[in-house]
């Protein structure tokens, strides 16, 4: 199986494969015996697609047959179309390249939609292909008929039904172009009697060299000069980075050193620098820490690079702020900014490095760095081996830290949504080569395994660790069979607390006792793994965790580690308010009264 480096790249991505570029620039027009399905497969392969995720169905038969005959694209059949969409979203989020998923007519397409929101909300290029009822039967409430354009209108940046083979080549080109340039979902509905039909014109999509990620946008020189003036005048500067700064992080580190500035990050940007980098202070908000929050508040100037951080309640309102983003519409929409610059982070930072003056006063950086040491020490205290390692359940902080300690240097962590996000976001420490993905902006429970399968399919030799709560894992439990069937060696760690943990915390924060629906019984996840033909492990105490963690991570195929964690453990808040303490206390009193049969 090809590794990441083996996949053909577009010239814009600095590929050495000039032969590949030549193929893009000079497509071959084949005989008119080519079908719409065959043209689509050829196009996808030419632009670098190597897997397609989906569930087979009769409306897709001509397409899946074209994939089978072509043999260059791997079909990965999933157990639920949402899993296909999540797998494609995971690939696209990790690589920035187009990924593809499929579902058949009606319900198959419906099931894709929930997973496609993962790509929409995290701005990842995904092409979704759905079958459709025969064009001649549309409009008469035919079996499984729906309105695909209406169904996909919100989730997709582009959605189109191909009703005539003559339009197929141009529409396919447009769909891929829109997925890249809108950084989101493009959807094609192709009726059963169209996808297998012969093309009446050119059999290849022209101008494939235009189908690539958006080029960088150079910001206006005058605005960068203004930003440099503000930075030079500020006594202290903090830099806040998001995923839009990923490709420029090395230059940002140089800028931070020149300005004696701490660098803060969003959750999605957590993996951009090693956790122990001297300027890497930490995150903000609940999946962050007090040092980052305080640095952002106390700096005389905040420089925001490539971030549209959505939680405005954690952002300062009185700090002088410069925001740089190539999406001009996000400037100033979360907080007031003094200077908003439309442009890509890379060229902006390059220009700033040439124009800003180096700062020699290290007092602010040293103060923030000392705060980081204290905060990390607090986190460490919650992640040590307990005095009695044979006593369970296991603290989730300890589990997350041990995963961090034992993971491969280039491991990919895929974290589900819920309280598991807090444990992994705060206690996993990444080396710089490791990656961490989650449902960053969709915040959907049950998305981690599907995304993990997609990422693992890119490179079956790279370690992929899925961290999920028991509730989230059971939502798409069948996707573990996808991993087994297609030999995707994902390692699934189940944070088993027998409840919807984050919902429980939110109830208590509001002063409410836990609702009975917040708790549930579980199956034996280790036995389930064995029933699927994989390996399963269980840990109920820290000692057992130490015993099984090595064999679990070394398992040659997919595996599940079922870890019984302490359900009552509370996350560490950056700043706790008195009313939160009061509400938690009242909730615990109410829960105790209910358990004793008293009034709620």
Description of each model-found segment:
Residues 130-171, 190, 215, 269-371, ...:
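Glycine-rich, acidic loop regions that bind phosphate or pyrophosphate groups
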